[in-house]
Amino acid sequence: MKITCIVTILALLSLASKAQTQGINKNYNAQLAKALNADDYGMKKYVLVILKTGSKSDLPKATRDSIFRGHMTNINRLADAGKLIVAGPLDKNALNYRGIFIFDVEEIEQAKALVETDPVIKSNLMAAEYLSWYGSAALKETLKIHSTIEKVKP
């Protein structure tokens, strides 16, 4: 009976030890995780913004062109400030979605304040939908990498 109990205890301790070490990433970089505000899963909260066709569409071409130049300038400003992590257009679609932004902010209100600085939003050429999104904290590194592969800056 004593031997059975001892063997059972040793087996349970062995299983508990394996459970604790299982899933631990050998490549884990605590300093980088902290710098990127990553949680234990390497993830963090962002705000995903879907840009869609707005209520204003009858502007002269010269005005639209000027607004879109301002839009690109604003994108670059927000990216340079480290707030805008991903931005890009979408192909034509039935939902009239035009593009996306992913902001390195946790609250939708913070993203709204940033989006409201964009000329396409101010002019109502586009409107925005906001969603909280939980994704890889490494996404923030995209900007550093992108700047090394971008031959022409828009």
What are the residue ranges of the model-derived segments?
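Conserved, structured core segments of small domains
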Residues: 20-154
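Bacterial Sec-dependent N-terminal signal peptides
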Residues: 1-24
